[in-house]
Regions:
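Bacterial N-terminal signal peptides that target proteins for export
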Residues: 17-26
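Sec-dependent N-terminal signal peptides
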Residues: 25-34
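Beta-strand-rich N-terminal accessory domains
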Residues: 39-186, 195, 203, 207-209, ...
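Terminal, non-catalytic domain-edge segments
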Residues: 42, 224-242, 466, 470, ...
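Low-complexity, Pro/Ser/Thr- and charge-rich linker/hinge segments at domain boundaries
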Residues: 130-134, 225-247, 281-319
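Catalytic cores of secreted or luminal carbohydrate-active enzymes
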Residues: 191-236
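Extended acidic/polar, glycine-enriched regions
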Residues: 253-296
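Catalytic cores of extracellular degradative/oxidative enzymes
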Residues: 293-565, 590
Length: 641
């Protein structure tokens, strides 16, 4: 009875203790559930789809025609293709190894004679495409391929740059190339990267002989990708840079979990250098020197790429050049991507900046002819800016920022106040016609404000800063919800946004603009990776520019493409704003890699189409047109200012 009375007396205390224990157990169970979900990152393959536990991403294209009509069961994950002069049996085996998925593909010659195989590929239809920015940020991946032999890998990252990502590493055999399938103007155009396939080396199998390719799929968090490769017995290849001047010594590290093998190579000649070790490699480029290469390109433009016929309505314009025809491209077939305006304004911007740093009377005279052509032939009196003298194509917003940038730089070169006003007038025309929400490439924030201030155009300077802030406010508000323009989502919409926001922050010191840029950085960084190649290291994914600006008009990955340097500009300004010098080093890698678009005789290529084959046709080539690639050198000058 005393116990009962005692219990009753302490009932409130006991109840309180039990409630506290319950709450602690509930908290513990929640923490345990969270921890288990964080650990449960196993990779699996079911119903023609790869899944990562706890992640909703469909990492692969649907191969039943429901996502894209042209992506059918032929392209299912793991299906192989090849050309052979005999019968080959391919056996596929999958199993779980802890959290990883291990796949083995065995090619067996069961015939009585030897069989030669070539053009071997295994379809890996990663879900890398651009329906719209919102879908991209939640349900699509950027696929970074490195066909590096025994050290080959794939890093597939959420396009928003956050969360759990998918990795693939070769553990037996070799991947030496990749193909892209189902590209075309009627198959997604610029918004569909294609069906990717990983390619093995050509081989000959004797009777009874087999070849095994094995890879391991695993999850990672992005910044631990290399660590996860090493943890699983793989090799990471790394150099401090991938473009070297002749006479320099390259240092390449081949890193595994046990040790690092360092190989040094004296770069004695220009051109490509392959540094190999035990089936893995790095691709380096030798050049005369960075500045010498730029000097040669500048001279080639002056000597070969300006229209100097006074009878031609394009007199003074800088134009495309056909390296195969060894001639100025007059564009008689009317392709808008070859017009003398548009992206070709980059030649004028480059020469103006170069002439500021290296005064040259001949160059300045050429630039004054070009400025006259733009103002009198490309533009209308109200600064409406066309793409060509014909003025028949659409009114393109991108043109305005480029032309304004050119005019502002012309003022800084010559001191002629009219050029500063022309730059201002061009941007006012842009805002009148396209509003504040247009995502231009190269809003000339720093050059424009500097030119107007030096010219004493205070009202115009203040108005332009107001305009820039109004645009930046929209960018901050939109965040990753980018509108569709010429491509539904792309590197050259997010990179210019970061670059622009950083420059507006530098002009105003208002933190909201830097914070806006910071929020975009994970998605921007997810567009490029660190493959050990001068063409791919810190180069953003682009896969349509060989079609739109090239002679062969081939869709497919372009590594490098000069607009990847917009990311270098963004990183450069972000490093200045934050003090994080790692972004400056990455910016330098990007602009160095783009020097591969320029040759020692001063010629250039608009695009290097990187896959081995596209739609079964041989690719991996430098396009014959020198078109719009000279922007890369303007960015080089910016990053190395």
């Amino acid at each position: 009875m005393g116990i009962i009375l005692n219990f009753a007396a302490n009932k409130k205390i006991i109840t309180t203790l039990l409630l506290k224990m319950h709450n602690k157990l509930l908290l513990l169970s929640c923490l345990l559930a969270y921890t288990l979900s964080a650990w449960a990152q196993s990779v699996s393959y079911q119903n023609n789809q790869i899944h990562i536990a706890g992640d909703d991403m469909d990492w692969l294209l649907k191969t039943d025609g429901s996502q894209y009509a042209w992506v059918t069961e032929r392209y299912q994950w793991g299906k192989s293709y090849y050309d052979a002069n005999g019968e080959i049996t391919v056996e596929t085996e999958r199993h779980q190894d802890g959290e990883d998925l291990v796949e083995t593909y065995t090619f067996i010659n069961k015939t009585k004679r030897k069989v030669s195989l070539k053009n071997i590929g295994i379809y890996t239809p990663f879900n890398d495409n651009y329906p719209d920015a919102k879908t991209c940020m939640t349900s699509r991946c950027n696929v970074h391929l490195w066909p590096g032999g025994k050290a080959a890998y794939v890093n597939a990252m959420h396009m928003n740059g956050t969360g759990t990502h998918l990795g693939l590493m070769v553990t037996e055999g070799e991947i030496t190339d990749y193909d892209v399938w189902e590209r075309g103007s009627k198959k997604g155009m610029s918004n569909f990267r294609g069906v990717m396939a990983l390619c093995m080396p050509d081989m000959t199998l004797k009777s009874g002989q087999s070849y095994r390719l094995q890879w391991r799929l695993f999850s990672h968090k992005g910044n631990d990708f290399n660590e996860q490769i090493l943890k699983r017995g793989g090799t990471i290849v790394r150099s401090n840079k991938y473009v070297y001047e002749t006479g320099e010594t390259a240092i390449v590290d081949f890193i595994n979990s046990k040790n690092t093998k360092t190989i040094t190579k004296k770069i004695a000649t220009t051109g490509e250098h392959r540094v190999e070790y035990k089936g893995s490699y790095a691709l380096l480029l030798g050049i005369s020197s960075e500045r010498t290469l730029i000097d040669k390109r500048i001279r080639f433009i002056l000597d070969h790429q300006q229209m100097n016929d006074p009878q031609d309505p394009r007199y003074g314009a800088f134009m495309c050049y056909d390296n195969e025809g060894d001639s100025l491209l007059t564009n008689t077939f009317g392709r808008s991507d070859l017009d003398e305006g548009r992206e070709r304004v980059g030649m004028g911007v480059l020469l103006t900046e170069y002439c500021r740093q290296h005064p040259d009377d001949k160059m300045q005279q050429a630039l004054e002819r070009y400025a006259k052509y733009i103002r009198e032939k490309l533009q209308q009196p109200d600064y409406r800016t066309n793409s060509s003298v014909s003025r028949k194509v659409k009114n393109r917003g991108y043109n305005y920022a480029w032309v304004a940038d050119f005019f502002f730089r012309m003022y800084l070169l010559t001191g002629n106040k009219q050029y500063a006003y022309d730059g201002y007038g061009t941007l006012q025309s842009l805002y009148r016609q396209f509003g504040y929400g247009f995502y231009c490439i190269d809003y000339p924030v720093s050059t424009g404000l500097k030119a107007l201030e030096q010219a004493g155009l205070t009202f115009e300077r203040d108005q332009l800063l107001y305009d820039f802030k109004a645009t930046a406010d929209i960018y901050v508000k939109n965040g990753l919800n980018f509108p569709k323009f010429e491509v539904n989502y792309e590197q050259s919409i997010i990179a210019p946004a970061v670059w622009f926001l950083c420059e507006v922050y530098q002009a105003t010191n208002e933190k909201r603009y830097l914070n806006g840029a910071r929020k975009l950085m994970p998605a921007l960084e997810a567009l490029q990776w660190q493959q050990p190649s001068y063409r791919m290291n810190e180069i953003g994914i682009r896969h349509w520019d060989g079609y739109w600006f090239g002679k062969r008009q081939t869709y497919g990955d372009v590594f490098p493409h000069y607009w990847s340097c917009i990311t270098a500009a963004a990183f450069h300004r972000y490093a200045q704003c934050t003090g994080d010098s790692s972004y400056q080093e990455r910016a330098k890698q990007t602009v160095r890699g783009n020097l591969s678009l320029f040759f020692e005789d001063g010629r250039a290529t608009c695009a290097f189409v990187n896959p081995r084959r596209v739609n079964g046709e041989d690719a991996h080539y430098a396009d014959a047109y020198a078109n719009d690639q000279d922007w890369a050198l303007t960015f080089w000058l910016l990053v190395n200012e």
